[in-house]
Structures are given as structure tokens and as C-alpha cells.
């Protein structure tokens, strides 16, 4: 029942690394649209979707959507081939730099197309009553209060630990849990990051998620070659 309409993107901007993630192009859409200053071009593949636009005055044209072919940035994706690597990766001093840089605002999560962390809260309808509900609400893994329990304890206590969690979730955990063999056809071995670069644009402290991931790839390379990380 869901129809997918793709808005064409032909030009990369400075923070984007979609080509590295394999998300720069697709053939999985029901309609594609190009919007210019003077006209709208559309390729409609789905008959039912085409019928929905029958009231529009349009003329036939030869339109095939184009895609970004190259970015200004090229990401080195961290190669985590075994779970035994997770402990030494977690212990890297590399993550400590984010303790000073990150202000834990969660802005990067709010603009991310794939962030889906949530919290569970109890909502009481009226003070003193016993009626209410338990709700699952959207949250941010970069917030100081994320994972905080009723007793005040926290699983991750620093911005650096939160950054480590986010990076590993995007570039290891998701694929390890859901698409181990890549059979689902998700780009780049099912990495959760799509390389849109919106988080880099949003961060008020100018922290680059691209640099964080690229830097981790370099640290892992050092580990694998026996160099000092």
C-alpha cells in the first residue's frame, strides 16, 4: 500500500559521503521527481500512483533520474570482523576526546534518518490517580540521561562512551544482529549510517561524525598491525 516517491539528488554537498555507504543510488522506487525552477519532471512506474495524478496537466518527456557519482569525502569504513575486537575497541583512549568536545545536546540524533533510540516513561493522567500509561518515546543516545535508571545509575557515563555506542551501533551492531550475511540487499553490508552528513551540519560544537568513524577505522588498522593506538 505504501508508494515510494524519490526526489532526485544529482549534486553532493560538502558533508555528504553517501557514495562510500552505497546509498547514492537505487532502483527501488515507484516514482522519481526532478524539480527545476520552471518545471517538474517525473518518472512514474506504478500504474495506481500514475492514476492518482491524472488530474495534472502534463506532457510526455524523456526523464531518467540521475544520481550522485562522487563525494568530496570518502569514508574508510571500520573493519570489525570479530566480536573479540569489541573490548579493545571500547577501551581505546580515542573516545576520550569527545568528553571535552560533546555537549550532549542530542542534535545529531534529531536530524538522523536512521536513529531510533527510545526511552520508556510513565504518564499519569491526573495527579493522585492510579490511571495512566507507559509510553515508548523517541530519545537520543547522546543525552546525559539516556539509559539512566530510577536510582540514578547510568550504563554509559561520559559523552565519549555515548559516541562509542553510537558509532558501533551504526557500523557494527546493526549488521551483526540483523543482516549477518548481507542477504537482505542493504547497502554497504547493512551499515545503519546512510552518509547524509546532516549530523555534521547540525552539531553546534563542530564535531564531525564522518571524522569520528574515519578515525576509528585508522585506530583499528593500528590495532591490526600491532602499532600503538
Regions found by a protein language model. Give the residues of each.
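Glycine-centered flexibility sites
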Residues: 22, 106, 195-197
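Iron-sulfur-associated redox domains of electron-transfer enzymes in respiratory
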Residues: 1-87, 95, 115-118, 126
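Oxyanion-binding "anion nests"
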Residues: 80, 102-113
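Short gly/pro-enriched beta-turn/loop segments at secondary-structure junctions
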Residues: 35-37, 96-97, 103-107, 136
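Ferredoxin-type iron-sulfur electron-transfer modules in oxidoreductases and energy-metabolism complexes
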Residues: 79-100, 118-229
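Secondary-structure boundary elements
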Residues: 10, 104-105, 222
Amino acid at each position: 500500500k505504501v508508494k515510494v516517491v524519490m526526489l532526485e539528488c544529482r549534486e553532493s554537498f560538502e558533508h555528504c559521503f553517501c557514495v562510500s555507504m552505497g546509498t547514492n543510488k537505487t532502483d527501488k522506487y515507484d516514482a522519481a521527481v526532478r524539480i527545476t525552477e520552471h518545471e517538474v519532471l517525473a518518472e512514474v512506474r506504478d500504474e495506481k500512483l500514475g492514476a492518482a495524478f491524472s488530474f495534472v496537466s502534463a506532457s510526455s518527456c524523456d526523464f531518467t533520474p540521475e544520481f550522485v557519482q562522487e563525494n568530496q569525502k570518502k569514508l574508510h569504513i571500520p573493519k570489525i570482523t570479530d566480536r573479540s575486537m569489541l573490548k579493545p575497541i571500547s577501551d581505546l583512549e580515542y573516545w576520550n576526546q569527545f568528553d571535552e568536545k560533546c555537549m550532549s545536546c542530542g542534535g545529531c540524533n534529531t536530524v538522523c534518518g536512521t536513529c531510533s533510540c527510545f526511552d520508556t516513561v510513565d504518564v499519569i493522567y491526573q495527579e493522585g490517580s492510579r490511571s495512566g500509561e507507559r509510553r515508548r518515546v523517541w530519545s537520543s543516545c547522546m543525552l546525559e540521561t539516556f539509559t539512566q535508571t530510577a536510582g540514578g545509575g547510568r550504563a554509559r557515563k561520559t559523552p565519549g562512551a555515548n559516541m562509542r555506542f553510537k558509532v558501533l551501533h551504526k557500523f557494527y551492531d546493526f549488521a551483526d544482529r540483523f543482516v549477518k550475511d548481507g542477504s537482505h540487499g542493504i547497502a554497504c553490508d547493512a551499515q545503519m549510517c546512510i552518509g547524509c552528513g546532516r549530523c555534521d551540519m547540525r552539531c553546534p560544537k563542530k564535531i564531525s561524525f564522518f571524522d569520528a568513524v574515519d578515525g576509528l577505522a585508522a585506530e583499528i588498522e593500528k590495532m591490526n598491525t600491532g602499532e600503538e593506538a
